[in-house]
Amino acid sequence: MSAHEGEIPDAAAPGIGRMSSDARREQIIAAAVAVFGAKGYVGTTTDDVARAASISQPYVVRLFGTKEKLFLAALGDSLETLLRAFADAKNDGRPGDVQEKMGAAYLGLIEMRGLHQILSQAFMLGAHPVIGPTARAGFARVWRFLRDDAGMSADDARQFLAMGMLINTMLGLRMTGEYGRDAGMTELLDGCFPESITTVLEEAPRVGDPW
């Protein structure tokens, strides 16, 4: 194998230098998570993702084939990241309530722009013939983790999921801009993020952000 096998020519991403194909794939998926999360599946093009990743659009198509396959790759990566964060929180060996630690881990994923939103986007695509089954399977995996691995009761698992969906909604609405301006939304944001409101205000997407 040559020293440069598996690397993408510089022309694929002007101004970025050589990068391994695996690293370039990770870069594209991270951009896809952010852009799909903000603009949705229908509203996003492969060119949008390419520009966000500073990659040529033909290379994105060459690597993933279609927008559908790119979305599935981004969704799969997001689900694996989510479940890995839950498992790490559950098994960290530190004292404390497992649900609280997993909840904190979920909030910590806000640093990965678009992760919460792409999950919400996927969960609204149940009628899609390809994405729908994948989204349902992913949601079922999360439920099984909460029940079987984390040992939550059915009621606790439902409440955990409900809070997660509320958090996703607040992030998707880019509601943090209302903090301190609207009393009701300030109260709700404080309730959703009681221990991490400062971080959320700093990290969450805001109105006007491209993603």
Predicted regions and their residues:
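Active-site-adjacent scaffolding segments
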Residues: 1-10, 34-38, 65, 72-74, ...
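N-terminal intrinsically disordered/low-complexity leader segments
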Residues: 1-20, 192, 200-211
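Helix-turn-helix
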Residues: 24-27, 31-69
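Hydrophobic/aromatic residues within well-ordered alpha-helical segments
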Residues: 67, 74, 78, 102, ...
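Hydrophobic alpha-helical connector segments
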Residues: 73-76, 83-114
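Amphipathic alpha-helical interaction segments
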Residues: 97, 101, 105, 118-121, ...
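Amphipathic alpha-helical segments used for helix-helix packing
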Residues: 107-130
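Hydrophobic/aromatic-rich alpha-helical bundle segments in the mid-to-C-terminal region
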Residues: 129-140, 146-211
